[in-house]
A protein has these predicted regions:
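Surface-exposed loop and turn segments in beta-propeller and other repeat-based domains
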Residues: 36-43, 84-94, 131-146, 196-216, ...
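Beta-propeller blade signature
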Residues: 177-194, 322-347, 385-394
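Asp-box/WD-like beta-propeller blade repeats and closely related beta-sheet repeat scaffolds
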Residues: 116-117, 123-177
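A short helix->beta-strand "capping" segment at the edge of beta-propeller domains
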Residues: 23-49, 346-353
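Loop/turn-rich, solvent-exposed surfaces of beta-rich toroidal or solenoidal domains
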Residues: 287-344
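Blade-loop segments of beta-propeller domains
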Residues: 80-108, 113-115, 131-140, 357-359
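Beta-strand-rich domains and repeat architectures in extracellular enzymes and scaffolds
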Residues: 39-70, 293-308, 313-315
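Structural signature of eukaryotic scaffold interfaces centered on beta-propeller domains
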Residues: 50-56, 99-104, 148-158, 217-228, ...
Length: 395
C-alpha cells in the first residue's frame, strides 16, 4: 500500500568559500547489508486510520494516529497505558500536518505542526510551550512516514529544533532565480524562547542556482546533525549531492560536497521562469516519477540514505501521462520507482541495503537501533500492529 498523500491548501497570510570541489565517488559494492530483526512488540485493539510509531522513550512506546492528533503510550508488554488528543480549539493543538514526535532532555514531546507551530507537551498532554508557526504556509504535500523531517539537537547546553518550511520568506508571489539565490533553507528554533534563525543558502554550484525555478518539494532539505562530530549532513530532495557542514560555531560552514552515484537517480534541470507559481509542490503531469532524496539517518559512523529513482522507460511514462497506459505498465513503473536505501560509509563507499517489507515504506533510526512496522494484510482492517527493531548486518 502506498502511503496516503495529504494535499491541503491554507489561504493564510553562505555560500562558503572553503568548500571542497564536488567529487563523484565510484560505487563500491563489496557486500550487501540488511536489517536483522532482534525483537518485536505487538499492540492490540487499536482503532486508528494512520497508526505510526513515534519513538521509544523511558520504557514506553509512543504511537500516533497521523490522521488526527491522537497519541498512544504503550508499556514494554504492549499494554496501553495512556492515550489523548489535541483536537479542536485547545492549548497545544496540532493536526495531521504535525511532524513525528521528538523528545527533549526532560522527556517532553516536541512536534512541529507546519500550520500551527511548535508544540512542547508533557507525556500526559499538558502544555509546556505553544509556539506560533514561523511563517504561514500556502500548501502542503507529504507522505505519512516513520522518517523524520525535523531533528531536535543540543548545542552548548541548549535545545533547538532544526527543520524547514516551504514558505520561509515573506510571501509576495514573486518567484524567480533571485528568490532562490537569496533563500536560506534551514530553520533553527530555540525551544525555550522560540527565537528562530535561518541558515543554509544553496551552495555555489548547486542545481538550484542555474537560473531556473523548481517545485517547492524539489527544494526541501533532507538532513542529519551529528552532535558528537558537530557535522551537519544535508541533501536537497532532487539533487544527489551530499553537503557536509562544520557546525561547531554559531553558523554551519560548508566543508565538503560530493555527488553520490545513486543508481537510477535522474537530475531535473528545472522550469523556465513563469512556468510554475510560487509555492507549488509538484505536478505529476509535468514532473512524473521524480528522483527524490527521501531520508538521511546516521548509523554509527555511516549514513543510511534512502531515495527513489526514476524509471528508464520514457515512452511508458509518456503513455501514463496521456492516460493511455495499461495497468501492467503502471505497476511496473511504480515498482521501478520504489524506494532504495544505501549505506554511505565514511570512506565514501556506497553499499546497497536490502529492505524488509515495511508499513509506510519507512523506518526510524535511534542510535544503532532500527525500528520498522510490519505491513498489515491489505484485505483486513488492522486493529493490531507489530513493531520490529533490529540492526544493520552485512550479508
Amino acid at each position: 500500500m502506498r502511503p496516503p498523500l495529504i494535499f491541503l491548501t491554507a489561504f493564510l497570510i553562505l555560500s562558503c568559500d572553503n568548500s571542497s570541489t564536488k567529487t563523484k565517488q565510484e560505487p563500491s559494492n563489496p557486500q550487501t547489508y540488511f536489517f536483522e530483526k532482534l525483537d518485536s512488540i505487538i499492540v492490540k485493539d487499536v482503532i486508528a486510520r494512520v497508526f505510526i510509531f513515534q519513538g521509544f522513550h523511558e520504557g514506553q512506546y509512543f504511537f500516533r494516529d497521523m490522521a488526527s492528533s491522537k497519541v498512544y503510550l504503550f508499556d514494554q508488554a504492549g499494554e496501553l497505558v495512556d492515550q489523548w488528543n489535541k483536537e479542536g480549539d485547545v492549548p497545544g493543538k496540532f493536526s495531521m500536518t504535525a511532524s513525528n514526535i521528538s523528545f527533549d532532555k526532560k522527556g517532553n514531546l516536541v512536534l512541529l505542526d507546519i500550520m500551527e507551530g511548535i508544540k512542547i507537551l508533557k507525556k500526559n498532554s499538558d502544555v509546556v510551550h505553544d509556539f506560533r508557526v514561523y511563517q504561514n504556509q500556502v500548501s502542503l504535500g507529504a507522505a505519512f512516514s516513520l522518517f523524520d523531517t525535523e531533528q531536535l539537537i543540543q548545542k552548548e547546553g541548549k535545545e533547538y529544533l532544526i527543520y524547514s518550511l516551504d514558505i520561509i520568506e515573506e510571501y509576495n508571489q514573486k518567484y524567480d532565480p533571485e528568490f532562490l539565490a537569496r533563500r536560506k533553507n534551514l530553520l533553527v528554533t530555540d525551544l525555550e524562547t522560540n527565537e528562530t534563525k535561518e541558515h543554509i543558502p544553496f551552495p555555489e554550484g548547486s542545481l538550484f542556482l542555474n537560473g531556473k525555478v523548481y517545485y517547492f518539494r524539489d527544494l526541501r532539505p533532507i538532513f542529519q546533525y551529528d552532535e558528537t562530530s558537530e557535522r551537519l549532513y544535508l541533501m536537497f530532495k532532487s539533487e544527489p549531492i551530499l553537503y557536509t557542514y562544520d557546525w561547531s560555531g554559531e553558523t554551519p560552514e560548508l566543508i565538503d560536497q560530493q555527488t553520490l552515484p545513486l543508481e537510477g537517480f535522474q537530475v531535473f534541470e528545472g522550469f523556465e521562469v513563469g512556468a510554475i507559481d510560487m509555492g507549488q509542490i509538484g505536478n505529476f503531469q509535468t514532473r512524473p516519477y521524480p528522483s527524490d532524496i527521501i531520508n538521511i539517518s546516521k548509523y554509527g559512523d555511516d549514513l543510511l540514505i534512502s531515495y527513489s529513482p526514476t524509471p528508464q522507460d520514457k515512452s511508458a511514462i509518456e503513455r501514463v501521462i496521456a492516460g493511455q497506459s495499461s495497468d501492467e505498465t503502471k505497476i511496473r513503473l511504480r515498482k521501478e520507482a520504489q524506494m532504495r536505501t544505501v549505506l554511505r560509509r565514511q570512506n565514501g563507499e556506497i553499499v546497497p541495503v536490502e529492505l524488509p517489507e515495511m508499513y509506510y515504506n519507512s523506518f526510524k533510526v535511534d542510535g544503532n537501533t532500527i525500528y520498522w512496522m510490519k505491513k498489515p494484510d491489505p484485505n483486513t482492517e488492522a486493529e493490531e500492529f507489530t513493531l520490529y527493531w533490529g540492526e544493520l548486518k552485512a550479508k
